């Protein structure tokens, strides 16, 4: 892939969305993971300024992720704010009848979304998305949580392509080497949740997208079954609510 042209196209897209909305800039959640780090880097290239990052850890968040996020803010000279969301999460735990790890992870994602949109209004800026194509196809995210945004410059790149672009843009090796994780709970791992590496997942997704029957026959049947199941089950996450026409 021509990463120079792709980078230019992404930066043009960011500039266009901000200009057409008459906004001042963008707001993003910076987790310390590769996706948000890449988006922050693209925003800085595209806008130079008016890029505001929110860092929103809980008490179980990986401290190394916060350190990496802070280093990136320093390297890019980004305006940022750290908001500890544990007290909000604790209030939910006291009231909710559903406190499974998945439920708490989803609620944490929606807390972060609420804060992002609060600062979006405060700063007259757009919330920019950080989900990649692999996550979007699988519905691997929280509806009205981390999937919520005004626009998304990286949603057409598979996770494996995210790594390639990150290397091209010289992101710190910490982002490239760390295991993919939404950091929703302690020691949470995307690949452990999904049961396969992103390399395998992307291979399967591409084969399904192009209907490459020859390649599909060579892949693990359990991988293809998992991908099809998640894509079908979570398809609603990528759609606007259906409205009855009268």
Swiss-Prot record:
Catalyzed reactions per annotation: deamido-NAD(+) + NH4(+) + ATP = AMP + diphosphate + NAD(+) + H(+)
Protein's UniProt name: NH(3)-dependent NAD(+) synthetase
GO cellular component: cytoplasm
UniProt keyword Endoplasmic reticulum, yes or no: no
NCBIfam families with a match to the protein in the record: nadE (TIGR00552), PRK13980.1 (NF010587)
HAMAP family per UniProt: NadE_ammonia_dep (MF_00193)
Gene: nadE
Bilayer-crossing regions: none
Positions that bind ATP: 29-36, 130, 159, 181
Regions annotated as coiled coil: none
A GO molecular-function descriptor: NAD+ synthase activity
Pathway stated in the Swiss-Prot or TrEMBL entry: Cofactor biosynthesis; NAD(+) biosynthesis; NAD(+) from deamido-NAD(+) (ammonia route): step 1/1
């Amino acid at each position: 892939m021509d990463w120079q042209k792709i980078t230019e196209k992404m930066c043009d897209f960011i500039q266009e969305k901000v200009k057409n909305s008459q906004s001042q800039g963008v707001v993003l959640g910076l987790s310390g993971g590769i996706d948000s780090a890449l988006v922050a880097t693209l925003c800085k290239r595209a806008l130079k300024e008016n890029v505001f990052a929110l860092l929103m850890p809980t008490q179980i968040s990986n401290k190394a992720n916060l350190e990496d996020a802070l280093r990136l803010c320093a390297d890019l000279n980004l305006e940022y704010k750290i908001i500890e969301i544990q007290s909000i999460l604790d209030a939910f735990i006291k009231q909710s009848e559903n406190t499974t790890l998945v439920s708490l992870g989803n609620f944490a994602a929606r807390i972060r979304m609420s804060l992002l949109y609060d600062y979006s209004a405060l700063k007259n800026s757009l919330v920019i998305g950080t989900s990649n194509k692999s996550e979007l196809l699988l519905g691997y995210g929280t509806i009205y949580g981390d999937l919520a945004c005004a626009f998304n410059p990286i949603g057409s790149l598979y996770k494996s392509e995210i790594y390639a672009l990150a290397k091209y843009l010289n992101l710190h090796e910490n982002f490239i080497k760390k295991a993919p994780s939404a950091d929703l709970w302690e020691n949470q791992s995307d690949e452990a949740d999904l049961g396969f590496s992103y390399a395998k997942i992307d291979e399967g997704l591409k084969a399904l997208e192009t209907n490459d029957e020859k390649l599909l026959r060579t892949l693990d049947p359990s991988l293809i079954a998992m991908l099809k199941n998640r894509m079908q089950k979570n398809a609603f996450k990528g759609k606007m609510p259906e409205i009855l026409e009268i």
